[in-house]
């Protein structure tokens, strides 16, 4: 018997999940939920499309609902809501708010007797697992995580939701000097700002207040406020020509010492490289 899958949201992530389910012999995609007009959605596999508001009607047809919305505004509401009807999986990645998100989803799942798995992805996700393994192997040490250089889909989505923004890409860029200090075994104490910079390329709507948009980006909590952020306003043509791909990746380091001797330096690292996350 195949596991019956539903997808909530049909952006780049939703299309990627659709392709992954299609290639998994033990999974069956039975429905797609969207906030848009279902008639406007053209899927790769021809799966039936329903309005998000019709979710409750599908509760006996779906075993697991995979949520593919954004962490800024979608998942905080959608995951606990859909957990009333289905076992759910999401990729919530606002690190500072994961405990709060867990509490809300956990409460909804306990009430409905469903199961929720949150923050699945590469970080949080694969990187989280590698931190646990590295900490078990090297308990006397420090963890370091560097993302990029690459396009953060979540941060790009957060920028696109700002009033006056037509399109946006956000690049997360590791600070090379910080990377080198970690690689050298220095075990530095680094602030958020010292580890990464952020660079935004924004297509503004005609007549939009660009100064207001830039201020909204640079002061956005949990996304940009703690980083040195550069904002570039560009044309739609330049966006399509120069920023149509979605490459990303990152590295996790565990640096420390063995046998209680600080001179016996040991390092563990894990890296992901993705040329493009476009489905």
Across the structure, where does each feature detected by a protein language model lie?
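C-terminal substrate-binding/catalytic lobe of Rossmann-fold NAD(P)-dependent oxidoreductases
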Residues: 4, 16, 23-53, 151-278
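Hydrophobic/small residue at the entry helix of a nucleotide-binding pocket
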Residues: 13
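Oxidoreductase and adenylate-handling cofactor-binding alpha/beta cores
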Residues: 126-142, 157-171
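General beta-strand structural signal in soluble alpha/beta enzymes
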Residues: 90-91, 116-120, 146, 170
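Rossmann-fold NAD(P)-binding glycine/threonine-rich loop
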Residues: 92-116
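Rossmann-fold NAD(P) dinucleotide-binding segment
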Residues: 55-64, 72-91
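Hydrophobic Val/Ile/Leu positions in short beta-strands of Rossmann-like dinucleotide-binding domains
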Residues: 5-7, 67
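Glycine-rich Rossmann-fold phosphate-binding loop(s) that bind the pyrophosphate
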Residues: 10
């Amino acid at each position: 018997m195949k596991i019956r899958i539903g997808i909530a949201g049909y952006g780049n992530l939703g299309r990627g999940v659709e392709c992954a389910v299609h290639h998994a012999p033990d999974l069956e995609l039975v429905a797609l939920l969207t906030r848009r007009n279902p008639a406007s959605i053209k899927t790769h596999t021809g799966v039936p499309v329903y309005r998000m508001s019709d979710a409750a009607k599908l509760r006996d047809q779906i075993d697991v609902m995979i949520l593919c919305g954004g962490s800024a505004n979608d998942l905080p509401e959608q995951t606990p809501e859909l957990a009333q009807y289905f076992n759910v999986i999401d990729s919530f990645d606002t690190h500072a708010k994961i405990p709060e998100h867990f509490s809300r989803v956990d409460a909804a799942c306990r009430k409905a007797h469903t199961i929720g798995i949150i923050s699945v992805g590469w970080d949080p996700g694969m990187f989280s697992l590698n931190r646990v393994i590295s900490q078990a192997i090297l308990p006397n040490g420090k963890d370091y995580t560097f993302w990029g250089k690459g396009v953060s889909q979540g941060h790009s989505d957060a920028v696109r939701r700002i009033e006056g923004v037509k399109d946006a890409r956000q690049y997360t860029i590791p600070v090379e000097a910080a990377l080198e200090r970690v690689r050298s075994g220095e075990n530095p104490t680094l602030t958020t700002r010292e580890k990464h910079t952020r660079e935004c390329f924004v297509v503004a709507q005609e007549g939009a207040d660009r100064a207001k948009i830039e201020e909204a980006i640079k002061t956005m909590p949990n996304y940009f406020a703690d980083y040195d952020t550069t904002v570039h306003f560009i044309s739609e043509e330049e966006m399509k020509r120069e920023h149509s791909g979605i490459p990303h990746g990152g590295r996790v380091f565990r640096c420390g010492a063995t046998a209680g001797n600080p001179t016996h330096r040991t390092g563990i690292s894990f890296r992901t490289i993705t040329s493009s996350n476009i489905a």
